[in-house]
């Protein structure tokens, strides 16, 4: 993916002295391209550190994002500096051998970045279509295998020219040109862009269809599970159920639906974020992969060198803007970025995986009216957590201290309005753990664990109902 320098296409077998460098142009290009490279390097390092330093981001999906950032980091740190020097000087100053190696690394990193987006799109399709089965389908071992396949496939695409699959090299070593051998151009364009693009678009079209269908069900206030014929309302009602098997089965079904609802909402938000990444990828790389085959197969229609340079650097730009997309479209990454940069927010830091609010109806008031005396537990920074365990349709809320020395129980006032904090510690389809406690908990006290019968739960994420 290296463009021609000067009039190399017309005199590739002749050696010319390098043209004098325009100082003002060199300074301007140096500032612009140097700033772009520095931004790309620091941004991708920030993405990697954000995932590495936050345990709640240690998931297979985020490992795929880290792999994308690694490919972009390698491109911006090892390829783009030489591309910038090439552009500023107007000729290649590093010899023929390094030109070939540099071009191969360029193709390797660009292909790995694109294939990583392809893997991410497949991951999002599985996450949105099968939110409860996702942890068993996408395991860490399978994720690692996928990452190895990404780099193996990228290596296969990139090493062809090193073994002679290219047009004859010019005698002038100040010329480092793109490999225009038609067979390799077709092979690399299909493998590096068009096949991954087809998969990406197919996956996101499917994600859009599934998300639209699920969202339509949520907006109507009803949710039907594929494995059951009964419809369950969005707001899950829990009442004292008989000890018989039917009551237990009903409670299990409702718990299943509520967790599925929550997981689907989170997967849909992740798909939106990565959908923006894919959209920017298409806008950045499509012009290059249109221009390159045209110039190779139809030399008479080869675009001017200036046009080729623009679309070439537009493709490079994609590796620099991904770190902007994450914090702008994902609150999760925004908070992680802020923590890494040690930016003090107006709100207290939350170590939760995802903020979750609960609206509760106390048993004594639930029958008097749906909204009367409804207790809202907003998101906060309490230092206690509860685990929800269910027996016969009744949820037990057990309050513990999360102090380092152990888990001491604390007092929860009978007046539930005094409870002012709630946040999620961890979530899986087996349990939900949250931070809940009074405004000024006293971890030193040890009292009987209270049990609260929940008649209605309304789940919300970041202030939005799910």
UniProtKB/Swiss-Prot annotation:
Residues in the signal sequence: none
Pfam families: 7tm_1
Location relative to the cell: Nucleus membrane; Cell membrane; Cytoplasm; Membrane, Caveola
Cytoplasmic-side segments: 52-63, 123-143, 206-272, 330-466
GO molecular function list: alpha1-adrenergic receptor activity; protein heterodimerization activity
Motif (Nuclear localization signal): 334-349
Known partners and oligomeric status: Homo- and heterooligomer. Heterooligomerizes with ADRA1B homooligomers in cardiac myocytes. Interacts with CAVIN4.
Name the record gives this protein: Alpha-1A adrenergic receptor
């Amino acid at each position: 993916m290296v463009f021609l320098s000067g009039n190399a296409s017309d005199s590739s077998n002749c050696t010319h002295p390098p043209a004098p460098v325009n100082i003002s142009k060199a300074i301007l290009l140096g500032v612009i391209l140097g700033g772009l490279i520095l931004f790309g390097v620091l941004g991708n390092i920030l993405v990697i550190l954000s995932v590495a330093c936050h345990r709640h981001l240690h998931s297979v999906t985020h490992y795929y994002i880290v792999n994308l950032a690694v490919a972009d980091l390698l491109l911006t740190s090892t390829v783009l500096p030489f591309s910038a020097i090439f552009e500023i000087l107007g000729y290649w100053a590093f010899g023929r051998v390094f030109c070939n190696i540099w071009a191969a690394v360029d193709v390797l990193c660009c292909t790995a970045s694109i294939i990583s987006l392809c893997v991410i799109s497949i991951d999002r399709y599985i996450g949105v279509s099968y939110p409860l089965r996702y942890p068993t389908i996408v395991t860490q071992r399978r994720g690692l295998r996928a990452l190895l396949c990404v780099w193996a496939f990228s290596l296969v695409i990139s090493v062809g020219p090193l073994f002679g699959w290219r047009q004859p090299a010019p005698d002038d070593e100040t010329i480092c040109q793109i490999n225009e051998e038609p067979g390799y151009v077709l092979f690399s364009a299909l493998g590096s862009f068009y096949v991954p693009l087809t998969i990406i678009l197919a996956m996101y079209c499917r994600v859009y269809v599934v998300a639209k269908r699920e969202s339509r069900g949520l907006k109507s206030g009803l949710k039907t599970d594929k494995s059951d014929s009964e419809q369950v309302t969005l707001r899950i009602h829990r009442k004292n159920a008989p000890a018989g098997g039917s009551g237990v089965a009903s409670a299990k079904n409702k718990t299943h639906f509520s967790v599925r609802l929550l997981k689907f909402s989170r997967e849909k938000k992740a798909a939106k974020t990565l959908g923006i990444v894919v959209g920017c990828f298409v806008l950045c790389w499509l012009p290059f992969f249109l221009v390159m085959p045209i110039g190779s197969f139809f030399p008479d229609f080869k675009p001017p060198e200036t046009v080729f340079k623009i679309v070439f650097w537009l493709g490079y730009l994609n590796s620099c803007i991904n770190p902007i997309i994450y914090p702008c479209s994902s609150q999760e990454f925004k908070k992680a970025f802020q923590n890494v940069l040690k930016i003090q927010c107006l709100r207290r830091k939350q170590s939760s995986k995802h903020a979750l609010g609960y609206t509760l109806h106390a048993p004594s008031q639930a029958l008097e009216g749906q909204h009367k005396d409804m207790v809202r537990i907003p998101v906060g920074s309490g230092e206690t957590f509860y685990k929800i365990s269910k027996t016969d349709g009744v949820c037990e809320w057990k309050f513990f201290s999360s102090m380092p020395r152990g888990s001491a129980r604390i007092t929860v006032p009978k007046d539930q309005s005094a409870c002012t904090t709630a946040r999620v510690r961890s979530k899986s389809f087996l349990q939900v753990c949250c931070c809940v406690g009074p405004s000024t908990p006293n971890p030193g006290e040890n009292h009987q664990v209270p049990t609260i019968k929940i008649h209605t739960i309304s789940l919300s994420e970041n202030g939005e109902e799910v």
